[in-house]
Amino acid sequence: MIHPLSDIQSTNIGVNTRIWQFCVVLAGAKIGAECNINAHCFIENDVIVGDRVTVKSGVYLWDGTRLEDDVFIGPNVTFANDKYPRSKQYPGQFHGSIVKKGASIGAGAVILPGVVIGENAMIGAGAVVTKDVEATTVVAGVPARLINSK
């Protein structure tokens, strides 16, 4: 189901994926099967979203971002992909983040460029993630720090 009030330019949308109102998905984006992309999301060209991924409202996925299968992205999570942003000056390469299988990111977290979030990791709401997060760990705070690991 693609809501009629969304602008979906990509033809690479998996079966049973739902994209709600006021979303923009650019032509080069790839979204897997059984995903749920909530209202007011923006997905750039060089973005890959796996299967069974939930992206809550207000999330922008910039070039270079990779979300593996079974990932949860809470509302208003911010991904950055440019380490030194300047108006009308673009890097030779964007540094998107990778969110590994089964990881969850809480509401309002900020993920800085190039960060890798490990499998089944949990990012607390409002955290600012400045470096890679190991698999099966919980991080929270500003900057994000280890809270728990299995």
Predicted features, each with a name:
Residues V77, A135-T137, R145:
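Glycine-centered loop/turn positions within well-structured domains
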Residues G108, A125-G126:
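Low-complexity, intrinsically disordered short peptide segments enriched in small/polar/basic residues
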Residues I123, G141:
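Conserved G/P- and acidic residue-centered "switch" motifs that form tight phosphate/ATP-binding loops
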Residues E119-M122, V128-T130, A135:
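Internal alpha/beta core interface subdomains
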Residues M1-P4, N12-I13, I19-V116, V142-P143, ...:
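Flexible, glycine/small-residue-enriched loop-and-beta-strand segment within the central core
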Residues V128, P143-L146:
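Conserved switch/coupling elements of ABC/ABC-like ATPase nucleotide-binding domains
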